[in-house]
């Protein structure tokens, strides 16, 4: 993807359609820049937009170069710096005809606007101090959010929750390094400005905070992109039937023929405000079929990628099979949530179910156990609740900061390494020069997240991911 020219001046006025491409009831054309009002007024028939108050709406007409009415529109006027971009902004709500949208943008360009590039409105908000870089990235996350949890985190970051925490950490680091460097300036006078015990305590607190943020990425990334759930088990255990039941759709082919699913099938659903990416895999068994063997190999790869594993057990098959399949699955289940799903309970007695539970508990002590009938839709809703609980975010503090961005995660890892080096240096009594350098490095990486310290290449890459009009 072509990167946005981050060095491009903000002197010109830009315009673009901000609503999704296509026909709709209403479309919004956004104009931003010091000549925003001037460019609109050339084609506007209505109240004098130069004289109206900021944050007001006005009904009027847009006329073409021949004076013919193009459309009736509503103009929303936002004067800088109290606007999204920090500049004068006018948003024109017109009818959603593609032709009207194209003609309106063409008129604005003829009036002196330039067509905006992808992400340019948000870039201007960043350059004009309306958003820091992590907030700007959160704008894109809000737009792309596919679940309640992902939306909640993105909105929190867009409103500055993450930024405030990072700012607080950087302020403490700045105070820390100032004391260290003050001592260096007066080293010949043997003056200690900072108690080493107190500095170690501060460094430990900062290390704990940075580590907690970095550790939250595992959950945050899953919330943002969906928790990967692998459905595994022997052929004909009901994996595809369960997937179809969860998706409320016949996505997977269901047959009494063992080995019908020979490859992985993926789809997503939202449960309890969380997105889950379900993966229906080929049945695990010994086979000489080359294609089925390839499917089984992919099954084990998907197990390694999954956060949650649903191990489907055909309750009508011999109990002895459980230990055999468990031996194949367990090596891939370390550190994951494993749920053993005993299926086809509509065909089983209470004694049968008890024996199966006992066999699972022996073969896989760490596995949670659920009993269902996917075909008869018995207790599938309870399994859905088990999935929500397995995601381990139900008890997350709604105000907690959770990292969802890989760039932020990488910066936090580097910041953590730097603060731990400083902590080791303080404990071992090495020169304050080296400790100060590590503290400044930690500050540097935290500053990269918010954009206080960054490069034009990084900024260009980030904003080029936005759609036109945002």
Per-region residue spans from a language model:
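A glycine-rich (often HGG/GG-containing) alpha/beta subdomain
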Residues: 1-152, 156, 160, 332-333, ...
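C-terminal-of-GTPase-core extension/linker across diverse P-loop GTPases
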Residues: 2-21, 148-270, 287-289, 305, ...
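Switch I (G2) and immediately adjacent beta-strands of P-loop GTPase domains
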Residues: 59-71, 75-79, 259-287, 305
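Generic enzyme active-site microenvironment
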Residues: 278, 312, 341
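Short alpha-helix of the ABC ATPase nucleotide-binding domain corresponding to the H-loop/switch region
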Residues: 284, 292-296, 323
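Inter-motif core of Ras-like GTPase G domains
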Residues: 292-316
């Amino acid at each position: 993807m072509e990167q946005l020219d981050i060095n491009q001046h903000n002197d010109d006025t830009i315009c673009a359609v901000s609503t999704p491409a296509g026909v709709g009831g209403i479309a919004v054309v956004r104009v931003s820049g010091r000549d925003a009002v001037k460019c609109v007024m050339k084609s506007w028939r209505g109240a004098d937009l130069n004289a109206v108050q900021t944050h007001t709406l006005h009904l009027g007409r847009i006329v073409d170069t021949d004076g013919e009415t193009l459309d009736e529109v509503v103009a929303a006027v936002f004067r800088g710096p109290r606007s999204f971009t920090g500049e004068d902004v006018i948003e024109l709500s017109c009818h959603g005809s593609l032709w009207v949208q194209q003609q309106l943008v063409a008129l604005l360009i003829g009036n002196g606007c330039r067509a905006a590039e992808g992400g340019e409105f948000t870039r201007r908000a960043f350059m004009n101090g309306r958003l820091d870089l992590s907030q700007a990235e959160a704008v894109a996350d809000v737009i792309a959010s596919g679940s309640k949890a992902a939306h909640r985190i993105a909105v929190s970051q867009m409103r500055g929750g993450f930024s405030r925490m990072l700012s607080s950490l950087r302020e403490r680091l700045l105070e820390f390094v100032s004391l260290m460097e003050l001592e260096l300036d007066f080293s010949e006078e043997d003056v200690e400005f900072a108690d080493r015990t107190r500095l170690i305590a501060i460094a430990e607190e900062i290390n704990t905070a940075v580590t907690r943020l970095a550790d939250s990425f595992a959950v945050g990334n899953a919330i943002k992109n969906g928790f990967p759930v692998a459905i595994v088990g022997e052929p004909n255990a009901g994996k595809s039937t369960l997937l179809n039941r969860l998706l409320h759709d016949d996505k997977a082919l269901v047959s009494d023929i063992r080995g019908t699913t020979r490859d992985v099938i993926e789809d997503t659903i939202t449960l309890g405000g969380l997105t889950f990416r379900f993966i229906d895999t080929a049945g695990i068994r010994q086979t000489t079929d080359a294609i089925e063997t390839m499917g089984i190999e992919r099954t084990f790869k998907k197990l390694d990628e999954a956060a949650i594993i649903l191990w489907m057990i055909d309750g009508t098959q011999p109990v002895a099979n459980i230990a055999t399949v468990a031996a194949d699955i367990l090596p891939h289940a370390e550190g994951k949530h494993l749920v053993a799903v005993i299926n086809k309970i509509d065909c089983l007695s209470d004694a049968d179910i008890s024996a199966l539970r006992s066999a699972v508990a022996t073969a896989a002590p760490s596995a949670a156990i659920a009993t269902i009938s996917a075909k008869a839709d018995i207790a599938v809703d309870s399994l859905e609740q088990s999935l929500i609980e397995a995601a381990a975010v139900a008890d997350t503090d709604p105000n907690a900061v959770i990292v969802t961005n890989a760039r932020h995660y990488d910066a936090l890892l580097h910041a953590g390494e730097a603060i731990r080096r400083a902590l080791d240096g303080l404990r071992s009594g090495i020169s304050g020069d080296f400790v100060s350098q590590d503290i400044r490095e930690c500050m540097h990486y935290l500053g990269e997240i918010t954009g206080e310290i960054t490069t034009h290449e990084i900024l260009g890459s980030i904003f080029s991911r936005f759609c036109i009009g945002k």
